[in-house]
């Protein structure tokens, strides 16, 4: 058997197969990296928007504001938030004319998978009680989100 036949019928097809497999592996890895980057960006955005909604309200619209924020929550945190807002926050805001405006100064992804993410937020909140001068507080919050039906929902909210 001649070497040209060995190369033509053995080595070249094997090399082509190896290159095809390598290209497929690289394509798969590229897709996984892109999916992770998208999940990271979406979860940070959801944590930022959700935190702003959870911590911002005006006395005349507090019920609507905080009820709307509930759509960004899930699990036991949804239950705890609902109880706290109905029992404490809404009545207090209406009686004492309390308004709050929260802004996220910085946000960073701590960890992200396809169905769960943890985001660290640095939050500034300005609170006004009646006609008193506003007070500002800064805090750090660790937000855990679950990806449910394609939506990132807050499942834990831990001040740190």
Swiss-Prot record:
Transmembrane segments: none annotated. One of its GO terms (cellular component) is cell outer membrane. Residues 1-22 form the signal peptide. It comes from the Bacteria. Its main location: membrane. This is Outer membrane protein MT2024.1. Keywords: Cell outer membrane, Membrane, Signal. It comes from Mycobacterium tuberculosis (strain CDC 1551 / Oshkosh). It is found in: Cell outer membrane.
